[in-house]
């Protein structure tokens, strides 16, 4: 019996690396730890003599001990120690990047975040070439595309976190309006992670009823507007971006991959094959419903959209094509 217990404890656990220990990164690490999904490696910069990744990892490790969660948590100051600890990662989550500052153009912001991203993708190629990457940094759709280009990974192994969060926000606003259990509400948001996201009301339900049968057109318009402005509302109230719900969205994706759950969820993915024909979109990463399992994106869910929803999705894709063209230009300058 004792030998079996020891063998169980020593069994190899999934390794999940999180690059960036800001609010989103640290909360991803926290949730991964509390759920015991695998060993957690937290990477961050060495700042003015301080090592936040090491400090936060130590705190999380002590929490895990307190709660009898048998995983390892380690912090790495990557500009001091490098990225060698990425070796053996099953999943790498990229949360690091800079927010848009006053006076920065869209091109300036993208260029700066591409430079940061390239440092990470070079390290992932060297040390974690078999991993699945989840991109959280913004602009997430464009940086997911750039990650595929920079790593040369199969597109199914590079996934952007967007639609899971946007769908949760849509669900929250529906719940606030009707006041029933979360479990009985299903919502779907596709497209870009931004003002051109597409809340898909034809595939959003309260119980067995489409929300279009529950709410009036004006009420639905209000719900859509609230969903599109959900992130901006938090910024206006707090002065910084959300982090609890984004972190939870990442961890839901990680859990489906690690445990091969094959859950269907909207993610920013590179559109190809049958999905490209169905949605009439190609050459970009955009939020679509996919099956997430141990291989990453295992399949596309081909949703039949209304005429209006299809037009809105194509409008979203057109904007992303412009960003992709800009990204290709800037990548050549790196």
Swiss-Prot record:
Catalytic activity: (S)-malate + NAD(+) = oxaloacetate + NADH + H(+)
A Pfam family matched in the record: Ldh_1_N
Lineage: Bacteria, Pseudomonadati, Aquificota, Aquificia, Aquificales
Residues reported in the UniProt entry to bind NAD(+): 19-25, 113, 136-138
Keyword Nucleotidyltransferase in record: no
Job of this protein: Catalyzes the reversible oxidation of malate to oxaloacetate.
CDD domains noted in UniProt: LDH-like_MDH
Family affiliation: Belongs to the LDH/MDH superfamily.
Gene Ontology BP, a term: carboxylic acid metabolic process
Domain of life: Bacteria
Keywords: NAD, Oxidoreductase, Tricarboxylic acid cycle
Gene Ontology cellular-component annotations: cytoplasm
UniProt gene name: mdh2
Enzyme class: oxidoreductase
GO molecular function (one): L-malate dehydrogenase (NAD+) activity
InterPro entries membership: L-lactate/malate_DH, Lactate/malate_DH_C, Lactate/malate_DH_N, Lactate_DH/Glyco_Ohase_4_C, Malate_DH_type3, NAD(P)-bd_dom_sf
Active-site feature positions: 193 (proton acceptor)
Presence of the UniProt keyword Chloroplast in the record: no
Record-given protein name: Malate dehydrogenase 2
EC number: 1.1.1.37
Annotated organism of origin: Aquifex aeolicus (strain VF5)
Binding site for substrate: 100, 106, 138, 169
């Amino acid at each position: 019996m004792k030998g079996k217990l020891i063998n169980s404890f020593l069994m190899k656990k999934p390794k999940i690396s999180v690059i960036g220990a800001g609010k989103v990164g640290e909360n991803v690490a926290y949730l991964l730890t509390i759920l015991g999904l695998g060993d957690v490696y937290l990477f961050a910069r060495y700042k003015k003599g301080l090592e936040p990744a090491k400090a936060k990892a130590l705190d999380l490790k002590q929490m895990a001990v307190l709660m009898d969660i048998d995983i390892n948590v380690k912090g790495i100051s990557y500009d001091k120690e490098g990225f060698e600890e990425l070796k053996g990662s099953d999943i790498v989550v990229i949360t690091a990047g800079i927010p848009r500052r006053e006076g920065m153009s869209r091109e300036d912001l993208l260029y700066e975040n591409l430079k940061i991203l390239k440092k990470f993708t070079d390290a992932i190629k060297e040390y974690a070439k078999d991993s699945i990457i989840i991109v959280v940094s913004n602009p997430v759709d464009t940086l997911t595309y750039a990650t595929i280009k920079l790593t040369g990974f199969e597109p199914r192994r590079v996934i952007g976190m967007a639609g899971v969060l946007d769908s949760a926000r849509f669900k929250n606003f529906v719940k606030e309006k009707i006041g029933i259990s979360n479990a009985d509400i299903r919502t779907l948001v596709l497209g870009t992670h931004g003002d051109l996201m597409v809340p898909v009301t034809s595939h959003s339900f309260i119980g067995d009823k489409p929300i279009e049968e529950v709410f009036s057109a004006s009420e639905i318009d209000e719900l859509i507007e609230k969903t599109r402005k959900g992130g901006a509302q938090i910024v206006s109230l707090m002065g910084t971006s959300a982090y609890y719900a984004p972190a939870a969205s990442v961890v839901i994706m990680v859990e489906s991959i690690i445990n091969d759950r094959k859950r269907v969820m909207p993610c920013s993915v590179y559109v190809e094959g049958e999905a490209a024909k169905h949605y009439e979109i190609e050459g970009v990463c955009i939020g679509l419903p996919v099956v997430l399992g141990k291989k990453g994106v295992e399949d596309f869910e081909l949703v039949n959209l209304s005429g209006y929803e299809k037009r809105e999705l194509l409008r979203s894709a057109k904007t992303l094509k412009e960003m992709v063209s800009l990204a290709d230009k800037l990548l050549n300058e790196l």
